[in-house]
Amino acid sequence: NKIFLVNWLEAISKFKMYLKIERGLSENSIESYSSDLKSFYGYIKKNKFSENPKKCNSEIIKKYIYDQSKINSPKTQARRISGIRSFFDYLTFESFIKTNPTDLIETPKIGKKLPDSLSLNEIIKFINNIDLSHPQGIRNRAIIETLYGSGLRVSELISLKLSNLFFKENLIKVFGKGNKERLVPMGKLSKKYIKIYLKNERLKSKIIKKYSDTIFLNRNGSQISRVMIFKIIK
């Protein structure tokens, strides 16, 4: 009963259906993925590479990324790489391909400053000074890595839900101003410390039912506040 993919457009169409049915993403988010994948497909056609996604390898993707780096910001590059990675994760999951050609490709650093305009050196110094043996240390490290690595606003971070995390695709679903939805890359360190936090400190917390899906909690088991985030940063 195995289905074989014939071309890129068919594969993108199946992926969009997966995002809608399995991931429950909004039409806007799905179209954002589709747009980025069609940009990559345009590059495939322009350079006369194979119409079969199974023939795509890491070298082709690296050349595309290099091409994109000349015209797009690191943030746009990161989003497009995440989209391509998620697409190939899906193809791997469905056994259309054996290995993901993006596995060894790094996502560009977004390099966005924290909300209170700390410099990169200040952020690194602060991260190194976090006491990971302290009960809230892992949570605070996860918060800083997510704020910096994914370029989130404090208001976006405190409202993040467990259901917003897609570890396999290295993506976070964020709801910004006006409840506008977008997908942002999840950095390796952010992913690492969120997972440690969820398996340890958060798991031991007495969580208020209302906040059972909220990621970052205070000692009382409710959503961490903006004020607390700024105290952590400072």
PLM features: what roles do these ranges have?
Residues 1-234:
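Conserved catalytic core of the tyrosine transesterase superfamily
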